[in-house]
Amino acid sequence: MRRELLLEKIETYKAIMPWYVLDYYQSKLAVPYSFTTLYEYLKEYKRFFDWLMDADLTQAPKIADIDLSTLEHLTKKDLEAFVLYLRERPSLNTYSTKEGLSQTTINRTLSALSSLYKYLTEEVENDQGEPYFYRNVMKKVSTKKKKETLASRAENIKQKLFLGDETLAFLDYVDKEYEQKLSNRAKSSFRKNKERDLAIISLLLASGVRLSEAVNLDLKDVNLNMMIIEVIRKGGKRDSVNVAGFAKGYLESYLAVRQRRYKAEKQDLAFFLTEYRGVPNRMDASSIEKMVGKYSEDFKIRVTPHKLRHTLATRLYDATKSQVLVSHQLGHSSTQVTDLYTHIVNDEQKNALDNL
């Protein structure tokens, strides 16, 4: 979503929220939480407040009028009823035949509510230096995590990674072969954005940054001499990320055409731009997801930008056998999340031995 559109949607949600949610928003903006995270949280709060009114757990006529006392006195049974509602409600996705939300979505909703409750019961201070209330019912609500062993997850994910020679083969395919299948009209659009698209894909494959980190990249954040980029990690921490050398040529080619092709002026700070009717804008996450999906599907299998992050992590672990190095590259504070890559690499080694 374009930054301008994202901020517009955030303001729409803020306009209907109770005052204490606006306090929460300002507090988390100072951390800083990303606008994307805050937008997702505001959506979850609307979902929750709508349910409170539908379930007659508040007498408030509108969301903005739901008072703190309502949240303070909700019971564990009330929150469990909300979870059941999420699990059983008809899906709003017209393309889905599933009833209710996925466990992942439910966990995200509960995470957003836990964050709000923690703020109200622990972090905020009233005029007496005390939180607004003390009873945090969210601490009594448990979440169910998807049960899957690392070995099973590794098996499921490795088919969607571009390992070994496939990393550069994917870039070469987009660069030299993809165009041959296109109509003349489609070729025109492809040629306009070819350098930019290759720069994005190569950066994701060469650095392992998250999609949001690539989207929010500004010109000043990119140092091609050192092959280092500056990103804002989850939790608002600024980090320097090394970029593999194979991306340099693609990034330089894009920079050579960025100003002219996307009508960029000095005030256009975003590194990756799109242009519509002569107006440059920061390329949004949805557009990058569609672009990566389009090229990868034509090459081998449709993947997301996050799978390109997994690709870099797996290749880096294969080359170094260092979970610490991989976790630093990905911006993780613990090596626990990198255990997945050891399973993928071990599987690859086993397959190589079987072929001897």
Curated annotation (Swiss-Prot):
Any one annotated GO CC term: cytoplasm
Top-level lineage group: Bacteria
Domain Core-binding (CB), first and last residues per copy: 16-121
Keyword terms of this UniProt record: Cell cycle, Cell division, Chromosome partition, Cytoplasm, DNA integration, DNA recombination, DNA-binding
Main location: cytoplasm
Biological processes, Gene Ontology terms: cell division; chromosome segregation; DNA recombination
Coiled-coil regions, chain positions: none
One Gene Ontology term of the molecular function aspect: tyrosine-based site-specific recombinase activity
Activation/inhibition comment: FtsK is required for recombination.
The Tyr recombinase domain, residue ranges: 169-354
Function per UniProt: Site-specific tyrosine recombinase, which acts by catalyzing the cutting and rejoining of the recombining DNA molecules. Essential to convert dimers of the bacterial chromosome into monomers to permit their segregation at cell division.
Similarity comment text for this entry: Belongs to the 'phage' integrase family. XerS subfamily.
Protein name: Tyrosine recombinase XerS
Gene: xerS
